[in-house]
Amino acid sequence: ISLSYQQATLADTKEVNVANSYNSSDTYLPEALSWTLETSPNYYKVLGESGIVENLFPPKGQIVYGGLDSLGRTLTVRGTLTFNNVLGSYNIRKDFKRSKAETLSGWLGNKNGEVYVIKGLGDDSYQGYFWNKSHLIADSLGGDALRVNAITGTRTQNVGGRSGNGGMRYTEIKSQKWLEAHRDGYLYYEAMPIYQGNELVPRAVVVSVLSSDNTINEKVIVYNVANGYTIDYNQGTFSANQ
């Protein structure tokens, strides 16, 4: 079950203010700009404990999308996820609508037939599309294919290298496995895009996860970069480094 942005704002003003102060993206911007392949070859880094504020989250089984800011950029998404969220996603792939209203900020798409090589360490290189419509809460965790639940992300931000278990997939896989093993439990799951100034494409996403038994309790930054390429985060364009 998902709640729309309008429904989410029924929370009282005090709670909304707490949410905004709790999640200041500027806090994480220096880290978002510090990525190197050598230190984070799978495009994520564990920052520490989740710091989850439980009263900011919806009832069990629900997801609240934070909507869009004045520039049309996706904001923080929070969900209190259960096994039923995962169960409802089995064998279902939701496609994003191709409409102007659902176009992600900074999204220019991929040219037909264009294939790019993003080199990793050793043999872990990716070959394929450069950009993905990257979910904040994955469809495998019950997230919807909506503009308010996605960003313009590099392929490596979405899944890491060729192995496909890095980037956003790191917390997604861990969370799905935990929910499948703890069918009576629940997870607080939060994904916050990190923007620099008025740029339309985020520099990173900070994902915070806390399980009801506290065996998962971590905050992870996922870098929206691609080794060997320079990205224009204002325009959503990129070029290969010489």
PLM segments and residue spans:
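Early extracytoplasmic/domain-onset interaction patches
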Residues: G51-I63
